[in-house]
Regions:
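Claisen-condensing/thiolase-fold acyl-transfer catalytic domains that form or cleave C-C bonds
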Residues: 1-12, 109, 113, 120, ...
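Flexible, glycine-rich active-site loops centered on histidine and acidic residues
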Residues: 10-46
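Beta-strand segments within the central parallel beta-sheet cores of soluble alpha/beta enzyme folds
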Residues: 16-24, 61-63, 128-134, 155-160
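Acidic-glycine-rich active-site phosphate/pyrophosphate-binding loop
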Residues: 21-27, 82-89, 142-154
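Condensing-enzyme catalytic core mediating Claisen C-C bond formation in acyl metabolism
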Residues: 35-106, 110, 114
Length: 178
């Protein structure tokens, strides 16, 4: 999403006509395979999309990027990309992606619903105007809850998270390719 926002700004400036955006993550290097609450949720992936200026009212109409660094404890990687071991040589049980799922779910649903409404308002559109929503593929339950909050239902939402898991920066390019 952040990459799309940056590319959108470059294209609107008129200095660029065509830009390749690549999103790739190897989350399998960051999961603790002994932690079944997180390791099954994430996947590796890469995707790319070429965006270009075109006349008319098609394409990316608006972007809104928000973040809240104070919520970092809801989802973070405690020790980086390398496994850590205790003094006995055992794998550190706190290694890898750490997530507070129920809390993260509530925050994500509220934030994605609100930012989607803001983006639509910025363009003078309503949720009913959405023909197809391609959200970040974080979690099926989050995507379903956001679709419900927007009143669009899943028939207007593209979803592939059940096949690939959360591929982080690659999720939207992969979904757009499909």
């Amino acid at each position: 999403v952040y990459g799309l926002s940056v590319v959108h700004s470059y294209l609107k400036s008129g200095d660029y006509n065509r830009i390749l955006l690549v999103g790739a993550d190897a989350l399998s290097t960051m999961v603790n395979w002994k932690d079944r609450t997180t390791c099954v949720l994430f996947g590796d992936g890469a995707g790319a999309i070429v965006l270009e200026n075109q006349s008319g009212d098609r394409g990316l109409l608006s972007t809104i990027v928000e973040s809240n660094g104070s919520l970092w404890k809801l989802l973070h990687v405690r020790t980086g990309h390398r496994q850590t071991f205790d003094q006995k040589g055992e794998q550190d049980s706190d290694w890898g992606i750490q997530m507070k799922g129920p809390e993260l779910f509530k925050v994500a649903v509220r934030a994605l619903s609100n930012v989607t409404k803001k983006a639509l308002e910025k363009c003078g559109l309503a949720p009913d105007d959405i023909q197809l929503m391609v959200p970040h593929q974080a979690n099926l339950r989050i995507i379903q809850a956001v679709a419900d909050r927007l009143g669009s239902g899943m028939d207007k939402v593209y979803c592939n998270v059940q096949r690939f898991g959360n591929t982080s920066a690659a999720s939207i390019p992969i979904a757009l390719d499909e």
